[in-house]
């Protein structure tokens, strides 16, 4: 998509924040309008995160207009809302390449631009990093400002409160902006969001308070009286003003779509000392009515026709693994009232919408709180229930201690349904599910299963759910299933693999859904093919049998080679003094950038041609 100067005459003048700050203030509303239209035109042609960016146009313009970026440091939490930021910071003409192989990174990324102070992708990290950056700036002595923008979904995470508690203690000069659009990826839940709703009733209190401070600030006795009166008013109007109790000077809420008002407020706050908190109200999907009405559907979009007002329907192909899980969950819950399902704010992505509607009293969206999700599940298990934690591989990393300390050590029957395992694709380095086998395999008493297709996935979910001697994990990928027939549910024998094809000299031990590629390679090389099924416990007997019957072994997995399933096979062979050559094929020792899943697998040699080439080169 080439940039149309005639269509965007004001935006054409802005290819850097320095150019933005040269614009007359009265032209900024027009700039916002053009920026929003350009975002719609670009993302509808290329795909990407959509509704969040539409809601932050005015805020982005105001921040870069008031602050001397990149000298002043602007930090975006998660980064879904940062597309306007990228457009205004020299990446306007490349925005159509976002999330594509070799294109712009899907989130703010330090290696891409000096304006991207913090690389992000996971939520709730901005305030912690911002405090560190603000402290460093203070010690540097260059009067550099620090601003963090965090959403109402991300601020529900415990890490954000840990950071604010620390900021209130050491009092760095920084500004935290809460972008309150009343909508994160899933519906926001929890007491904090109820509290934010209560804050909306405090506009009169906020204006009276700030006005009174200005009028009476020079009169000490009245100033002290105002402070005492304020404490009483605070208790009556806004019970427990949370952010001020944490040590922040709270201002707001203010209209996040009034660019002139935002500029005025930010200028007033820019030179204030200590931790400042600005609460702005925005509308996710602002300016595009279909996204305003359905911001969840329009959170991330494929290519679509903006004039149609709707996203293209799926071609009616095979169901995704998330739906396979969701269907199994509903089927099992209908038969067992003990099932409890937990998600950390990923209802739609994890395939749990139908379950949440059919079984609302057994569905728990704990918000962006992975640590709490796991220990909450532990408590349910202690209480005699059967918790299923549906979580993306990349987000389970955030609750690792809870998996060990609160679940595994106590041998509690918690099942982890690990979605987005392996290569995820367009979201890049921060979202690849590359490490779960490695970080779970070393936990004692953990049972880990890797299905090769959707039927095996269902059987493993059934097996894990009915396993009562400790935690279990079933990991499955993003994307569509393979179209195999679904058979009646039955428990699989724990730790047993299956030989799928008998060959000569070479045996391929496959873990997971690369099985179709492995089957092609086995056929081409006349190799034995094994569906290992279990990463833990491994089928030691079968591994030793394969070692005895073949000249060499190949392990195949879509997980980091280091510490993964293949490493487990190596350990078995060494423990039994079997010096059989083994080639471990999996994800390499670097963070895998964005691109389609197919592009990544081809580049990494994890398609059939690449796997065959790796094996032939190794055997040569």
UniProtKB/Swiss-Prot annotation:
Mg(2+) binds at residues 152, 181. Keywords: Isoprene biosynthesis, Magnesium, Metal-binding, Thiamine biosynthesis, Thiamine pyrophosphate, Transferase. GO terms for biological process: 1-deoxy-D-xylulose 5-phosphate biosynthetic process; isopentenyl diphosphate biosynthetic process, methylerythritol 4-phosphate pathway; terpenoid biosynthetic process; thiamine biosynthetic process. Thiamine diphosphate binds at residues 80, 121-123, 153-154, 181, 288, 370. GO terms for cellular component: cytosol. Pathway: Metabolic intermediate biosynthesis; 1-deoxy-D-xylulose 5-phosphate biosynthesis; 1-deoxy-D-xylulose 5-phosphate from D-glyceraldehyde 3-phosphate and pyruvate: step 1/1. This is 1-deoxy-D-xylulose-5-phosphate synthase. It comes from Salmonella typhi.
């Amino acid at each position: 998509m080439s940039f149309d100067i005639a269509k965007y005459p004001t935006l054409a003048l802005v290819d850097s924040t320095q150019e933005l700050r040269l614009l007359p203030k009265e032209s900024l509303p027009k700039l916002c309008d053009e920026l929003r239209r350009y975002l719609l035109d670009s993302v509808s042609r290329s795909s990407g995160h959509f509704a969040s960016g539409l809601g932050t146009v005015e805020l982005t313009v105001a921040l870069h207009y008031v602050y001397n970026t990149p000298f002043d440091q602007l930090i975006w939490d998660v980064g879904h809302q940062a597309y306007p930021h990228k457009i205004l910071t020299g990446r306007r003409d490349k925005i159509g390449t976002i999330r594509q192989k070799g294109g712009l990174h899907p989130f703010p990324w330090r290696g891409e631009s000096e304006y991207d102070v913090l690389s992000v992708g996971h939520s709730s990290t901005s305030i912690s990093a911002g405090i560190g950056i603000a402290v460093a700036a203070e010690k540097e002595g260059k009067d550099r400002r620090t601003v963090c923008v965090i959403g109402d979904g991300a601020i529900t995470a415990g890490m954000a409160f840990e950071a604010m508690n620390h900021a209130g203690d050491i009092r760095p000069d920084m500004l935290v902006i809460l972008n309150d659009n009343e909508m994160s990826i899933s519906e926001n839940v929890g007491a904090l969001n109820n509290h934010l709703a209560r804050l909306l009733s405090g506009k009169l209190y906020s204006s009276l308070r700030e006005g009174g401070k200005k009028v009476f600030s020079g009169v000490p006795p009245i100033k002290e009286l105002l402070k005492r009166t304020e404490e009483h008013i605070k208790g009556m109007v806004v019970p427990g003003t949370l952010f001020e109790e944490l040590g922040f000077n709270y201002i707001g809420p203010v209209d996040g779509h009034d660019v002139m008002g935002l500029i005025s407020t930010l200028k007033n706050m820019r030179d204030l000392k200590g931790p400042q908190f600005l609460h702005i109200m925005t509308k996710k999907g602002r300016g595009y009515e279909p996204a305003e009405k359905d911001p969840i559907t329009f959170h991330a979009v494929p290519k679509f026709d903006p004039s149609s007002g709707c996203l293209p329907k799926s071609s009616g192909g095979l169901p995704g693994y998330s739906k396979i899980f969701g269907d199994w969950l509903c089927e099992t819950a209908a038969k067992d009232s003990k099932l409890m399902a937990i998600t950390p704010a990923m209802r739609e992505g994890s395939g749990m919408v139908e379950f949440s509607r059919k079984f609302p009293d057994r569905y728990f969206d704990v918000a962006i709180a992975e640590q709490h999700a796991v220990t909450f599940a532990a408590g349910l298990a202690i209480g005699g229930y059967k918790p299923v934690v549906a979580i993306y591989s990349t987000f389970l990393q955030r609750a690792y201690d809870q998996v060990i300390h609160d679940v595994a050590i106590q041998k509690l029957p918690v099942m982890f349904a690990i979605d987005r395992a392996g290569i995820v694709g367009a979201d890049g380095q921060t979202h690849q599910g590359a490490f779960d086998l490695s970080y779970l395999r070393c936990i004692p008493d953990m049972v880990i299963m890797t299905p090769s297709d959707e039927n095996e996935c269902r059987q493993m979910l059934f097996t894990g759910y009915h396993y009562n001697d400790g935690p279990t994990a079933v990991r499955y990928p993003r994307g569509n299933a393979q179209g195999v027939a679904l058979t009646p549910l039955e428990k699989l024998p724990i730790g047993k693999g299956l030989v799928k094809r008998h060959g000569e000299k070479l045996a391929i031990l496959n873990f997971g859904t690369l099985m179709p590629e492995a089957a092609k390679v086995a056929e081409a090389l006349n190799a034995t093919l094994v569906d290992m099924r279990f990463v833990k416990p491994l089928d030691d007997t079968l591994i030793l049998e394969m070692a005895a019957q073949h000249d060499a072994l190949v392990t195949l997995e879509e997980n980091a080679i280091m510490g993964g399933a293949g490493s487990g096979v190596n350990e078995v062979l060494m423990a039994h003094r079997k010096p059989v050559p083994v080639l471990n094929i999996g994800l390499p020792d670097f963070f895998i950038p964005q691109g389609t899943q197919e592009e990544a697998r081809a580049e990494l040699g994890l398609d059939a041609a690449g796997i065959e080439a790796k094996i032939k080169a190794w055997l040569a």
